[in-house]
Amino acid sequence: MEFRPLRADEIECRVSTVSEKGVSLLLYKDARCDMNVLDESIGPLNWKREHTRDNANCIVSIWDESKSQWVSKEDTGTESYTEKEKGQASDSFKRACFNWGIGRELYTSPFIWINASDVNLIPKNNKYTTYDRFSVEEISYKDKKIVGLKIRNENKKKTVFAYGYFDEDIDNLSKKIGQAKINLLKKEVERIRMADKQFL
């Protein structure tokens, strides 16, 4: 069973770190995204979730018609700051869905850094914070890896991060320089991406 990669509107952005120089972001999915993908891909009656150990663990099972049995994958979650039991149940469910491959491509995200000029920073207790909201404006994949990503600051109403390449970029390039040179460019982008990961 393989699941499609997530669309831009299904991916959330979370602020990871904040300093006077800017903020770093992480990409994540919520439990509703997982439920929607499961419903869409295999049907709402062909999967189920169970929680054990006081919601610490979640088992997501998918019906295998060829074997006439449920196939299950399990993972554990962590508590949220606001709602302990609900947050833990949601987190364990999302992690179990990662085990099935839903949203696993998010692990290939580049390091997302937003400069201070593109975010509203607020001094607080000798540190900085921000209440800006960020969204994934566009995303592209190749071989289950993120190769293109654009992030929008909804408060400033502009694109504040751009990485890699997109299908329309390739189409435009192919008309100008030919497919052979495009393939070389793709390899170079991938080489730089791997080098960045090793550096980080």
Task: Write out the residue ranges for each language-model feature.
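Strand-helix-loop interaction patch of compact alpha/beta domains
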Residues: E2-E50
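Positively charged, aromatic-enriched nucleic acid-contacting surfaces
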Residues: A31-F166
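Interfaces that engage single-stranded nucleic acids at replication/repair/recombination sites
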Residues: M1-S19, V23, W113-L200
